[in-house]
Amino acid sequence: VQYDLTFKTKFVREPIPFDTEEGEMDYTFPTDAEVIVTDFIEGYGMIQLIIADESYAVDFYFNADAMDPVIGVPAGVYPIDGSFESGTVLACKGILPDGPAQSYFCGLDAEGYLDPLQLYCLVDGTVIVENVNGKMKVEVDAVNSYDVPVVLHYNAADSAVENIPTEKVGTQKRIRT
C-alpha cells in the first residue's frame, strides 16, 4: 500500500514580549552615525554591526566567514533568519535580562539607553550591505514578530553636499533696508 500525502500549514509567528505591535518604521541614519563593527565571537564567523545616532540604534549579528578588511561586514544580501548559516543575519529571539537578543532596531532615551517602548525585534527580511568606494551602505527591509515593517537606510558614502534638497522653500525671508 502506498499513500500520497500532502500537508498544508500556515506558519504562525509567536509575538516577542515588548516588541512593537503597530506603527511601521522607515528611518534613515545620518552619514555621521556611529558605526561599530566587531568580530563578536572570534573564529566563529559572527560579526556584530551597530549603527546608532542620538535617537535610534540598530544591532545586527551577521553569520560571515571573515570580516571585510575595508568596511568590516562583507558586501552581500543577507536574509534574516535563525539558521546560523553563513551569509545570514541572526533573527531576534527575544529579550534577555540585559536586553534584546540578536538583531533589533530601537529608540534611545535621553541618556542613550534602549527605549523598550520603541523596540522592533527583527525576525524576517533582508539586509543588504554594499561597499561604495570604501564606505558602507546598508539597506534593511524587515519585519518584527508582529509583522510590522521596518525599513532602514544607512549610507556613509553620502555627503551633506550630495543630500541638499533641490525643491524651493515655501517661505521666503526678506530683510528690510
Q: Positions of the model-derived regions?
A:
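Edge beta-strand at a domain terminus
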Residues: V1-F29, F62, G125, V140-T177
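Surface-exposed helix/loop patches within compact recognition domains
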Residues: T28-E130, I175-T177
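Hydrophobic residues embedded in beta-strands of well-ordered beta-sheets
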Residues: M136-V138
